[in-house]
């Protein structure tokens, strides 16, 4: 039986040292039994592979009519979204015969040269824009970037693709950040894998010495964490 996209992505996260199990304190103050470090995708091989995973998820979503095929550009919020947008656009072209643009924003507006807030494929009225980002905690980056996109042109945001959905309640709602963004903006938010899929996949994996990758303690703490904070 072929491994699922989520299972293969979990293997990739582990091989890239982007997924760690242990004791971590998040920005929210929550004590988490796992941590995802997007900064681990720090060379050409890893970022190319990551882009291919995003492209595969996008292709699946197109087949299921979750997002349209006629995407004009992939947009990544600065700074972490920049390599995601570029590598995803390359992978869509190389592996899925889709030629799409890539666009990202500047943190500060440029008043000389090409100028403006945006870099890459220019945004024009009527364009279909697909957002890409790594892990959503509260949806802050999305809420900041949507007004910038709309100020640039009357574009249609057709969706957002994340690497991992943490599936956690936000501080002021029982909704997850993903569901809150979907409800607020009306476009689908997809992920290559969600945290439950990651733990299910990791629970079946073994270390090189044959011992389980996830200790019984980590599995118990993961279950307790999702029981308390899961949405």
Curated annotation (Swiss-Prot):
CDD domains according to UniProt: PRTases_typeI
Gene Ontology CC annotations of this record: cytoplasm
Enzymatic class: transferase
Cofactor(s) recorded in Swiss-Prot or TrEMBL: Mg(2+)
Keyword Glycosyltransferase: yes
One example of a Gene Ontology biological process annotation: pyrimidine ribonucleoside biosynthetic process
Catalyzed reaction equations: orotidine 5'-phosphate + diphosphate = orotate + 5-phospho-alpha-D-ribose 1-diphosphate
EC code: 2.4.2.10
Keywords carried by this UniProt record: Glycosyltransferase, Magnesium, Pyrimidine biosynthesis, Transferase
Pfam families from the UniProt entry: Pribosyltran (PF00156)
Binding residues annotated for 5-phospho-alpha-D-ribose 1-diphosphate, in chain numbering: 27, 79-80, 106-107, 110, 112, 133-141
Origin: domain of life: Bacteria
Protein purpose: Catalyzes the transfer of a ribosyl phosphate group from 5-phosphoribose 1-diphosphate to orotate, leading to the formation of orotidine monophosphate (OMP).
Family, per entry: Belongs to the purine/pyrimidine phosphoribosyltransferase family. PyrE subfamily.
Subunit structure: Homodimer.
Protein name: Orotate phosphoribosyltransferase
């Amino acid at each position: 039986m072929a491994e699922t996209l989520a299972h293969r992505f979990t293997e990739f996260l582990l091989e890239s040292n982007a997924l760690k199990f242990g004791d971590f304190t998040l920005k929210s103050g929550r004590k988490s039994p796992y941590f995802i470090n997007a900064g681990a995708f720090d060379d050409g091989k890893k970022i190319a592979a990551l882009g291919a995973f995003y492209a595969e998820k996008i292709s699946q979503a197109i087949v299921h009519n979750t997002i349209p095929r006629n995407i004009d550009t992939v947009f990544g919020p600065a700074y972490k979204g920049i390599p995601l947008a570029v590598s995803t656009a390359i992978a869509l072209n190389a592996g899925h015969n889709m030629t799409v643009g890539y666009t990202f924003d500047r943190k500060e507006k440029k008043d000389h040269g090409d100028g403006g807030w945006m870099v890459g494929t220019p945004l024009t009225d009527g364009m279909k824009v697909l957002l890409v980002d790594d892990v959503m905690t509260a949806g802050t980056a999305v809420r900041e970037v949507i007004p910038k996109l709309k100020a640039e042109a009357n574009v249609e945001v057709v969706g957002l693709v994340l690497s991992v959905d943490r599936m956690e309640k936000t501080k002021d709602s029982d909704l997850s950040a993903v569901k809150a963004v979907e409800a607020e903006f009306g476009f689908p938010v997809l992920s290559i894998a969600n945290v439950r899929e990651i733990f299910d996949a990791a629970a079946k994996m073994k270390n090189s010495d044959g011992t389980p990758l996830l200790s019984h303690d980590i599995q118990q703490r993961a279950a307790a964490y999702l029981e308390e904070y899961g949405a």
